[in-house]
């Protein structure tokens, strides 16, 4: 499942087959173009956060924008921090956060750009019931407002049932 997300998100190259986004084969791009594609078009939520330990919550969330040399939309950042319940933690480092808070930072980083594609590997796996509900609401709203394609991997049947389309992988087969 993680390999599938990495291939779809331009992180790992497939050994065979092609990945098309907006009619373009993603892997016909060189590494620099692929990096821009990932920063601008894909929001990745990893199962184990992948936060930069020396960056604050705010800096981790805005990393894709800063790597692109673009101006940060402070209203969007403020809105995300509020929704993610991280306003009071915005200057904290990942080591100063709980696992659930770190996951919310990772989700914020994936959503900050309003990318065309959101790829989420167990985005609510480390969250309590209330935060799970809030995150799923945020993902649904983002999907509707920005008309994003969202691929979410979960073992939680209740979360899966919220999807427009459900595909199951069993024993390595779709």
Regions found by a protein language model. Give the residues of each.
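Conserved switch/coupling elements of ABC/ABC-like ATPase nucleotide-binding domains
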Residues: 171-174
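ABC family nucleotide-binding domain
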Residues: 2-169
């Amino acid at each position: 499942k993680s390999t599938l997300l990495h291939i779809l998100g331009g992180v790992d190259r497939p050994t065979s087959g092609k990945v098309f986004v907006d009619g373009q084969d993603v892997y016909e791009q060189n590494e620099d173009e692929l990096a821009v594609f990932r920063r601008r078009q894909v929001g990745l939520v990893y199962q184990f956060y992948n936060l930069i330990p020396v960056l604050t919550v705010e800096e981790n969330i805005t990393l894709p924008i800063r790597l692109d040399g673009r101006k940060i939309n402070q209203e969007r950042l403020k809105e995300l921090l509020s929704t993610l319940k991280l306003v009071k933690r915005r200057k904290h480092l990942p080591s100063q956060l709980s696992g659930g808070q770190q996951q919310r930072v990772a989700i914020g980083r994936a959503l900050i750009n309003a990318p065309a594609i959101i790829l989420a590997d167990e985005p609510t796996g480390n969250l309590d019931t209330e935060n799970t509900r809030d995150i799923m609401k945020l993902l649904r709203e983002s999907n509707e407002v920005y008309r994003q394609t969202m691929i979410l991997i979960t073992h939680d049947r209740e979360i899966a049932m919220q999807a427009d389309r459900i595909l199951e992988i069993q024993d390595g087969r779709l």
